[in-house]
C-alpha cells in the first residue's frame, strides 16, 4: 500500500516520492500482466534492501521505453513469483513514474548463470528483461537465474 501510494504521488507531482521517510529507494514504475492479474511496483535500485520490498531497476540499464535492455530483478518467492506463469505472447505493461505506458509481449524465457546472462543493456531495440532466481522451488539461492525476455511494441501516455 505504501509503495502504491508513493508511486501514484510520484505520477501526480512529477517528483520522486519515498514510500516512507527513511527509505533509500522510491518507485519508478509499475509492472502489470493482466492475463494473470499480476502487478508489482519497481523501485529505483536493485540493492538487497530495495529488493526486500519489490523489483528493482538495475543501475546502468535504460529505463523502459528507452533504447537498450531495461532489467528488473526481484525475488522468486515474493514479487516475481508470477514469472513462472508467464507464457510467450503474454503482454507485460510497464507504467513509468512519468505516467507513460509501454507494452512488451513476452518473446521467451531462459535460464542462465548469474554471471553469464548475456544481457547487453546497450543492444539495439527496446527490450525488457525480468530476472529472478532459479529454480522456483529452491530453498536457497543458487547460481542460476530465470529470465523473461520481452520486446516493446507500443508506447502511450
Would you name each region that the model predicts?
Residues 1-157:
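Solvent-exposed, non-transmembrane regions of membrane-associated and secreted proteins
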Amino acid at each position: 500500500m505504501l509503495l502504491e501510494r508513493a508511486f501514484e504521488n510520484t505520477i501526480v507531482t512529477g517528483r520522486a516520492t519515498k514510500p516512507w521517510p527513511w527509505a533509500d529507494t522510491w518507485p519508478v514504475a509499475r509492472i502489470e500482466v493482466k492475463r494473470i492479474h499480476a502487478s508489482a511496483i519497481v523501485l529505483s535500485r536493485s540493492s538487497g534492501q530495495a529488493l526486500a520490498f519489490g523489483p528493482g531497476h538495475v543501475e546502468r540499464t535504460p529505463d523502459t521505453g528507452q533504447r537498450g535492455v531495461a532489467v528488473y530483478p526481484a525475488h522468486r518467492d515474493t514479487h516475481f513469483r508470477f514469472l513462472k506463469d508467464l507464457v510467450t505472447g503474454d503482454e507485460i505493461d510497464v507504467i513509468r513514474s512519468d505516467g507513460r505506458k509501454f507494452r512488451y509481449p513476452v518473446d521467451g524465457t531462459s535460464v542462465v548463470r548469474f554471471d553469464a546472462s548475456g544481457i547487453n543493456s546497450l543492444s539495439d531495440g527496446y527490450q525488457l528483461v525480468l530476472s529472478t532466481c532459479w529454480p522456483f522451488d529452491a530453498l536457497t539461492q543458487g547460481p542460476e537465474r530465470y529470465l523473461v525476455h520481452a520486446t516493446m511494441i507500443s508506447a502511450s501516455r
